[in-house]
Swiss-Prot record:
PANTHER family: PROTEASE DO-LIKE 5, CHLOROPLASTIC (PTHR43019:SF23), SERINE ENDOPROTEASE DEGS (PTHR43019). Belongs to the peptidase S1B family. This is Serine protease SplC. Its main location: secreted. It holds the Pfam family Trypsin. One of its GO terms (biological process) is proteolysis. The keyword Hydrolase applies.
Amino acid sequence: MNKNIVIKSMAALAILTSATGINAAVVEETQQIANAEKNVTQVKDTNIFPYNGVVSFKDATGFVIGKNTIITNKHVSKDYKVGDRITAHPDGDKGNGGIYKIKSISDYPGDEDISVMNIEEQAVERGPKGFNFNENVQALNFAKDAKVDDKIKVIGYPLPAQNSFKQFESTGTIKRIKDNILNFDAYIEPGNSGSPVLNSNNEVIGVVYGGIGKIGSEYNGAVYFTPQIKDFIQKHIEQ
């Protein structure tokens, strides 16, 4: 990711899955992710809400939205198949909420970068509360709506390999909402694809899909959860 490029259109946003081959200068900078200037902090306990509603892929993020159901991006899910595994709210070497197999993948039919996955309820490797997925995680709820200047947070796994799968929280504000696109200034990096965007009540208003990894950027993007998108997601939540 070249940080000197000015992104001039939403179509040019870089997707935020983590990639190998990052040069040494970028790695050195990203190792300083949790500093005050970026408004990024490492999550101290991923076993409490809302942090226990976030899951990790090997190079991206997702979050729980209902029984055995998680949301991420299409550009994340395209690299996965039924039977592949996700990890519930890992916390570096402190443990995680269990490892689970993907049961089904349903991409949103429009252009929006959303994918819904159903997860096998029984873990391959158990979490602290046993083998049941729903006992080790807590689903996030939809926000009714959102508006410009609302305070938000993004929770996820930026640069997961480099950061040893530690969870981070980034705070900022909504800069604009147009149709199903939400722009915000919270700091994000590769690996944040699929992260939930939460309001001050820890309700989810969208899913991160891209940005430029620059402090103060107002071009970071998420799919805003319109009524139509919420309806699609609700239909794919396991009953």
